[in-house]
Amino acid sequence: MADIVIRNIDCITGESKESGKDMLHNVTLIIKDGYIDKILTDEESKTPFGQELIDKECGNAAYILDGNGRVAAPGFVNTHTHIAMGLFRNYADDLELMDWLQNAIWPAEAKLTNELVQIGTRLGIAEMFRSGTTCFSDMYFFMNDTAN
């Protein structure tokens, strides 16, 4: 039984552009237990088997969504973050780099507490999830607090 069926959605596959399979158009995604269980192309959806499968899954699905005009993509991976620094966004952002670091950021970082780093990390994770990032590698101080 499907949890979610999304019809008419475009899907980035992760295949190379040269393969010609980098993007699927007007597919049906069948999602079970939080995972994509099946992807039916537009052609497959129109076969008797495909239509029967979609009808069965749609009949049992908690949600049936129209994905027209939307794109499903694999989760993004951010391999270099300073995640808690999101707390300093827009802080003295009109300064040149070294002036910004030496006179604004480094003095502010010296006042960071473990709790503030954890709050900044949670904020950064929420922002990444909203933009499709599902995994990150952090390069900031307070590694244990970031992990917590």
Region locations from a protein language model:
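N-terminal metal-binding scaffold of metallo-dependent hydrolase/deaminase domains
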Residues: 1-56
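Active-site metal-binding motif and surrounding structural segment of the metallo-beta-lactamase
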Residues: 46-73
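Histidine-centered catalytic micro-motifs
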Residues: 74-86
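Active-site gating loops and adjacent loop-to-helix segments of metal-dependent hydrolytic enzymes
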Residues: 87-119
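Active-site loop-helix segments enriched in His/Asp/Glu that coordinate
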Residues: 109-148
